[in-house]
């Protein structure tokens, strides 16, 4: 069984935990469709930075 060599002080414990805080997700709005998406990710419609980069099933059905 692992046993620590010496007791960890509250200050040291707090310094270790200082990087564990949760942050809110960064969201962006696409200029073409106005859809909200994660930064640096394409939208559900297949747009990235205002340009169509991938054909999705929903857009293929609408075009037919």
Curated annotation (Swiss-Prot):
<dbReference type="GO" id="GO:0003735">
    <property type="term" value="F:structural constituent of ribosome"/>
</dbReference>
<feature type="region of interest" description="Disordered">
    <location>
        <begin position="1"/>
        <end position="35"/>
    </location>
</feature>
<keyword id="KW-0687">Ribonucleoprotein</keyword>
<dbReference type="GO" id="GO:0015934">
    <property type="term" value="C:large ribosomal subunit"/>
</dbReference>
<dbReference type="InterPro" id="IPR002677">
    <property type="entry name" value="Ribosomal_bL32"/>
</dbReference>
<keyword id="KW-0689">Ribosomal protein</keyword>
<dbReference type="InterPro" id="IPR044957">
    <property type="entry name" value="Ribosomal_bL32_bact"/>
</dbReference>
<protein>
    <recommendedName>
        <fullName>Large ribosomal subunit protein bL32</fullName>
    </recommendedName>
</protein>
<dbReference type="GO" id="GO:0006412">
    <property type="term" value="P:translation"/>
</dbReference>
<comment type="similarity">
    <text>Belongs to the bacterial ribosomal protein bL32 family.</text>
</comment>
<dbReference type="InterPro" id="IPR011332">
    <property type="entry name" value="Ribosomal_zn-bd"/>
</dbReference>
<dbReference type="Pfam" id="PF01783">
    <property type="entry name" value="Ribosomal_L32p"/>
</dbReference>
């Amino acid at each position: 069984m692992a046993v620590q060599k010496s007791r960890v002080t509250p200050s040291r414990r707090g310094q270790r935990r200082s990087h564990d805080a949760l942050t809110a997700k960064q969201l962006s709005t696409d200029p073409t469709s106005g859809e909200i998406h994660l930064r640096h990710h394409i939208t559900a419609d297949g747009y990235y930075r205002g340009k169509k980069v991938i054909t999705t099933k929903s857009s293929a059905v609408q075009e037919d």
